[in-house]
Amino acid sequence: MTKIRKFIERIDDELEDAKHYAEKYIECKAKGNSDRASKYHAMAEDELKHAAWLHEMTAGEITELDKVFRPTEELQRRWDDSNARYVERAAWVRRMLEM
């Protein structure tokens, strides 16, 4: 269960970094610095990819844990909250990167 908690923390970290880079992308694009904007865009996409992989690994860990015993209510709640944050934040970053 500690592994799952750590995965959840890393997902949040990756999404926060993706958000930061997406904001810098918009800022640089607005200032006409397309070279730097392009780099921030790529960095944001990389962070989104990392978050997606971690999300996938966490879902797999939860599935494996479910075969042995039911996760605690607290862990299930943390995962449900993390999943909702992941969906919301990843969608926000993707929208920013489409600008």
Which residues does each predicted region cover?
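Non-heme di-metal
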Residues: 1-99
